[in-house]
Amino acid sequence: MNFETIIGLEVHVELNTNSKIFSPSSAHFGEDPNANTNVIDWSFPGVLPVMNKGVIDAGIQAALALNMDIHKEMHFDRKNYFYPDNPKAYQISQFDEPIGYNGWIDIKLEDGSTKKIRIERAHLEEDAGKNTHGTDGYSYVDLNRQGVPLIEIVSEADMRSPEEAYAYLTALKEIIQYTGISDVKMEEGSMRVDANISLRPYGQEQFGTKTELKNLNSFSNVRKGLEFEVERQAKLLRSGGVIRQETRRYDEANKGTILMRVKEGAADYRYFPEPDLPLYEIDDAWIDEMRAQLPQFPAQRRAKYEEELGLSAYDASQLTATKALSDFFETAVSLGGDAKQVSNWLQGEVAQFLNAEGKTIEEIRLTPDNLVEMIAIIADGTISSKMAKKVFVHLAKNGGSARAYVEKAGLVQISDPAVLVPIIHQVFADNEAAVADFKSGKRNADKAFTGFLMKATKGQANPQVAQQLLAQELQKLRD
């Protein structure tokens, strides 16, 4: 029997507000344990939550970016559970009236086609703290993360393969990153993914029993975990077994999933409206204000790059991988840079430099204007393409004017025949054996003189002019 795969994803995104959702503590990542806490985070008796308006702003922007309807009257709920990293013994979340609902995004499949994935809801909530189990037999609780604002984005079960799930996550991350509400760095926990997967016989309408997957710390592991589950569940069903509703974690070392616990249902959390927070009214003016702050998203930018700038689909995709890179490209083109040349540099030397340095384009000194200036002085013959690589590294590390650096460092390309011809004559004088080989008709003897000339000019001879002048002077030797 063959089975159809049914996948839905729950994505937690940490919002990059300065303070937490219900307390004034810093929400920044990477501080010493429990440095970013106060009495609200520790749930001291009598303390009350105070809503951070910036979190609702971010929630509205996320909902708009994901084509969602927005609840005009929004409230919070208590999700009750006990765990050491949750000192209140409940989490403030949203249950029946999330900030956003009924959304969708398009994903690009491997065959080039597009598929629409529906999004059931996006709700705001507070993050929990973090438990660390030490080798000394003690467990430690760090509440820096407690109260950091989250938006949980829950898709419909519209994905039919691990590949589609991967494509959905890629598209979702791009959109959220473009809004600026989160850096969506999985390595820092600001984007976390839980996957729900079930199988059903082809032609059956009813969903099978789902399994939830956790510990998916990369998009690659999401795909691998889902692929393993497809095989595990299909094998179990074909042998007459029964799929239980359970939570499993992906074990990277063993390339498989391991049972964590039998899955709880929503009733286990005993949701009820949060009594310490009011109803929040979101009017059209507030929504319009947030909509005005949204950027042009990757899909629209890719279409523009292909249709208006004549770039390939591949180039357009690479240039929109991050908003910072796309913004850099657009600024460079607006300053007069040739779109294809700017694209080539960003995908070539710039990308290699960023990878080697472990940095993003915002973290280096290269700017759109000095890149455009460098491309211009390549085009006008001031420097060669080879010399430009040295100039680029200087600009990336130090910034400044490309032309000013070239002139100060003595890197201007030599194109004047009055300068080059005497150097060519000196090359002939210094390499009598090569001249003799050339005069005797030895095969490819003329090729050596190009290297001699470039060495004599420290690589500054204009290659095209040098080749032309060398050919003329060698012809004179032959005559």
From Swiss-Prot:
| Protein's organism | Streptococcus pyogenes serotype M4 (strain MGAS10750)
Tell me the protein family, please: Belongs to the GatB/GatE family. GatB subfamily.
For this protein, the record's Pfam families field holds: GatB_N, GatB_Yqey
The entry describes its oligomerization and partners as:
Heterotrimer of A, B and C subunits.
Protein biosynthesis found in the keyword field? yes
User: What PROSITE patterns would the database entry show?
Assistant: GATB
Task: Provide the GO biological process annotations.
Answer: glutaminyl-tRNAGln biosynthesis via transamidation; translation
Q: What is this protein called?
A: Aspartyl/glutamyl-tRNA(Asn/Gln) amidotransferase subunit B
Organism classification: Bacteria, Bacillati, Bacillota, Bacilli, Lactobacillales
Q: Which UniProt keywords apply?
A: ATP-binding, Ligase, Nucleotide-binding, Protein biosynthesis
Record's SMART domains? GatB_Yqey (SM00845)
Q: Which PANTHER family match?
A: GLUTAMYL-TRNA GLN AMIDOTRANSFERASE SUBUNIT B MITOCHONDRIAL AND PROKARYOTIC PET112-RELATED, GLUTAMYL-TRNA(GLN) AMIDOTRANSFERASE SUBUNIT B, MITOCHONDRIAL
- List the catalytic activities from the record: L-glutamyl-tRNA(Gln) + L-glutamine + ATP + H2O = L-glutaminyl-tRNA(Gln) + L-glutamate + ADP + phosphate + H(+); L-aspartyl-tRNA(Asn) + L-glutamine + ATP + H2O = L-asparaginyl-tRNA(Asn) + L-glutamate + ADP + phosphate + 2 H(+)
> Which E.C. number(s) belong to this protein?
6.3.5.-
Job description of the protein: Allows the formation of correctly charged Asn-tRNA(Asn) or Gln-tRNA(Gln) through the transamidation of misacylated Asp-tRNA(Asn) or Glu-tRNA(Gln) in organisms which lack either or both of asparaginyl-tRNA or glutaminyl-tRNA synthetases. The reaction takes place in the presence of glutamine and ATP through an activated phospho-Asp-tRNA(Asn) or phospho-Glu-tRNA(Gln).
What's the superkingdom here? Bacteria
Q: Does the keyword ATP-binding apply?
A: yes
